[in-house]
Amino acid sequence: VISQNWLHGVFLDVKSFFVPGTGFDTGRELVNRVVSDTQKTTISFEAGQAGADRADPSVNWMATKGDATVAYDPAFTPSLPEFNPATGKVNDVAVDPGIAIGHELIHATHIMAGQISGLSPVNYTGVDGTPHRAKFDEEARTVGVGGSPRADDITENDLRRQNGIDLRNNYSDYAVP
């Protein structure tokens, strides 16, 4: 579990984290991928931000392994569309800070592996069954709603399932044509 502390830093919640089979296997695997990779991910505090990028802009992040940078502010919790299965409705809900950093660490694993799935728009179906269009294939893939996934992907929605949080319905920047 990734948690926010009162100093606006990030720490790993030790409770249940190192004990396999406690329901936190997806988060544990994500952190393991980040810390055990030969490539480096640097996380820095940037007020009002959550984002991931390649450390060296000259690296082709779609085909070449490279180091990643993550900008993160635990107090930055924008409202995101979550699908509530009990009501069948999508509601904008402030994102859990652990899910926010998890989303960016997923991007970091893609960058470190040289497997960013693309920066082209992609059409997909949201969790609620409605059509959406993401500005970038990589974002739909990272959320777990579409794009060009790989068999071993960890997604934001996997982390949400693990923590009992409603799934993110979509990552939309554009209207569907």
Predicted features along the sequence, with ranges:
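Extracytoplasmic/secreted cell-surface and envelope-processing proteins
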Residues: 54, 79-83, 110, 118
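Auxiliary, metal-adjacent structural segments of Zn-dependent hydrolase domains
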Residues: 1-77
